Amino acid sequence: MVQVNSNYLKLKAGYLFPEIARRIKSFSEANPDAALIRLGIGDVTEPLPLACRNAMKVAIDEMGTNTGFHGYGPEQGYDWLRKAIAKHDFQTKGCQINAEEIFVSDGSKCDSSNILDILGSSNRIAVTDPVYPVYVDSNVMAGRTGDANQSGRYAGLSYLPINAENGFAAKIPSEPVDLIYLCFPNNPTGAVATRAQLQEWVNYARTNSVLILFDAAYEAFIQNPDLPHSIYEIEGARECAIEFRSFSKNAGFTGTRCAFTVVPKGLKGKSDDGSDVELWNLWNRRQSTKFNGVSYIIQRGAEAVYSAQGQGEINALVSFYMRNAAIIRRELTAAGIEVHGGEHAPYVWLKTPDDMDSWGFFDHLLQNAHVVGTPGSGFGAAGEGYFRLSAFNSRVNVDEAMRRIRAL
């Protein structure tokens, strides 16, 4: 009989969001008339920008002609999109990133997991706690951890607590690590890093030969012009960091799928014999072997993000969701609930009232307010006693959800 990958058996009972879906399904079957408002999973709700829709329509029509048809595209992405990304997202901010260093993909979630394909299994790994679960679970699946303890923490991972006491800013690891995941603006806490904080991480990584995997999926939501959007705005980051970005949240591409990863040329790791190896070459080889590229139609839609019309429309989308976040913060604060985040990120991280545990508060909101959020403990042991609410919904639903919560 075929052997399974037993590392999957080490995973906790369920990935956070499937467990939420299971509880919602059970509740909805018992309460079919309940009008649920979902402020849980970070899926957008507003329509795709018109500039992107029009660009995709043109691309579809092109595909219906002999001269405009496109089959397999380059695995790394079309040059015109890579150049637009490099120019608008990096070079305009002083980052020395060129088009060849951009790899277009179908999701930063995929890339942050798939990057493990090119990294050795003996690397010592650090994650924040709480943390986006994919970083942990992908390492478990790949056999890079031991078993989980009672709190859900896995042997072989270094956990860096982030909480109100430390301003949701992890401290530099006290034990040696080779690989660290950083996410700013942070999911789930909504915290953001200053230039000085990122410079400290880059200095640490360069001094200790550590690779930073930097998730910047929510950078478009940063409101303060003095805060960095990319780790490559920090001196020395090209030598120690890979960055993941996405069109999902700023341009509403959760259903159309387009993202990109930046792997600077010259960024190196060690082979088994101790020689230096460029990670760009390995990632390029990995993508060429395991990925067929994002569709031409979708990439044309993503390119339109960088048009004048597209920029105006995605800025309006971001402003819409950030207004939702401001409403959530205001109403929860008025209800006497301690809140964090929601100022430079579409997530509000709240302290559960009355010492309720995270899943208890989830069930409380579901049963009594018919509002769905995300239990903080699902993001790690240090998330216990916290809860995440997402700003991704209509204004009407956000207002109604807050009315219901305040009425509890």
From Swiss-Prot:
E.C. numbers: 2.6.1.83
Record SUPFAM superfamilies: PLP-dependent transferases
EC category name: transferase
Top-level lineage group: Bacteria
Chain sites annotated for binding substrate: Y15, G42, K109, Y132, N187, N292, R388
Pathway: Amino-acid biosynthesis; L-lysine biosynthesis via DAP pathway; LL-2,6-diaminopimelate from (S)-tetrahydrodipicolinate (aminotransferase route): step 1/1
Binding site residues for pyridoxal 5'-phosphate: Y72, S108, K109, Y132, N187, Y218, S246, F247, S248, R257, N292
Annotated catalysed reactions: (2S,6S)-2,6-diaminopimelate + 2-oxoglutarate = (S)-2,3,4,5-tetrahydrodipicolinate + L-glutamate + H2O + H(+)
GO molecular function terms attached to this record: L,L-diaminopimelate aminotransferase activity; pyridoxal phosphate binding
Keywords: Aminotransferase, Pyridoxal phosphate, Transferase
Cofactor: pyridoxal 5'-phosphate
InterPro entries documented for this protein: Aminotransferase_I/II_large (IPR004839), DapL/ALD1 (IPR019942), PyrdxlP-dep_Trfase (IPR015424), PyrdxlP-dep_Trfase_major (IPR015421), PyrdxlP-dep_Trfase_small (IPR015422)
Gene Ontology terms describing biological process: lysine biosynthetic process via diaminopimelate, diaminopimelate-aminotransferase pathway
Assembly with partners or alone: Homodimer.
Family: Belongs to the class-I pyridoxal-phosphate-dependent aminotransferase family. LL-diaminopimelate aminotransferase subfamily.
HAMAP family recorded: DapL_aminotrans_1
Role of this protein: Involved in the synthesis of meso-diaminopimelate (m-DAP or DL-DAP), required for both lysine and peptidoglycan biosynthesis. Catalyzes the direct conversion of tetrahydrodipicolinate to LL-diaminopimelate.
PANTHER family noted in UniProt: AMINOTRANSFERASE
Protein name: LL-diaminopimelate aminotransferase
Organism for this UniProt entry: Prochlorococcus marinus (strain MIT 9313)
Lineage, broadest ranks: Bacteria, Bacillati, Cyanobacteriota, Cyanophyceae, Synechococcales
